[in-house]
Amino acid sequence: MQFDIIGDVHGCYDELMELIDKLGYEYKRGSYDHPDGRLLAFVGDLTDRGPHSLEVIRLVSHMVKKKTAYYVPGNHCNKLYRYMIGRKVQVKHGLETTVAELNALSEEERIEVIAQFKELYEQAPLYHSFPEDKLVITHAGIREDDIGSYGKRVETFVLYGDITGETNPDGTPVRRDWAATYQGDWWIVYGHTPVRRPRIIHRTVNIDTGCVFGGALTALRFPEIEFVSIPSRQPLVSEKFRNFPG
């Protein structure tokens, strides 16, 4: 199979549409199709912080329903879902922007988009694995030994990365650089941690190039292992990007 795997969108709908066009997709029959039969995939964190989270929800949920795209949830998706089903969550760290968009809708529109997202989230796997391609699409990564497993420990890693339980001064969790020691045969394509440019190491590819923080929105063309990016229209927030050795 041939994929165009897109990093964390975070409500950057305009950049997403520009990227889809640059990748060669055409609007047909209510969805976006590629003339070569390629399929889009999303590594999660569709919403929060950016200006048009609900438009991203509408687009991705429609494409997944039409079976023209794959989606896996990220930690922001998980939090938004818990908010939508009435769980007590803190409306901050970006969620407040999506909630503001929801509150600006009519009741009918709000009910509709909540139903769309809940269906998208509830029907999504924790991660997608494609054995014939030796490919896993996940939000924050996965250990090779955990491919095929879906317990709570695996869920925590997939949504948040290899967290230590400690926190950084800005309140974010301290995460180990799991990719640096990965030795598996599977390609692991993920996002979650904003980097200045796509990071390939040991068959792992981080494609979160921090669009919502003024970086870029990036797609990995698989199996070619080529990158296609669109510059962000958002202001640059340099401190949000992580630098790795080498």
From Swiss-Prot:
Stored CDD domains: MPP_Prp_like
Cofactor (UniProt): Ni(2+)
Keywords: GTP-binding, Hydrolase, Nickel, Nucleotide-binding
Gene Ontology molecular function: any one: bis(5'-nucleosyl)-tetraphosphatase (asymmetrical) activity
CC annotations in GO: cytoplasm
Entry EC number(s): 3.6.1.17
Recorded coiled-coil stretches: none
Signal sequence, start to end: none
Catalytic reaction(s) noted: P(1),P(4)-bis(5'-guanosyl) tetraphosphate + H2O = GMP + GTP + 2 H(+)
Keyword rRNA-binding listed: no
Class of the enzyme per the UniProt entry, highest EC level: hydrolase
Family indicated by similarity: Belongs to the PrpE family.
NCBIfam families linked: PRK13625.1
HAMAP family found in the cross-reference section: PrpE
Function: Asymmetrically hydrolyzes Ap4p to yield AMP and ATP.
Name of the protein this chain belongs to: Bis(5'-nucleosyl)-tetraphosphatase PrpE [asymmetrical]
Organism: Halalkalibacterium halodurans (strain ATCC BAA-125 / DSM 18197 / FERM 7344 / JCM 9153 / C-125) (Bacillus halodurans)
Annotated gene: prpE
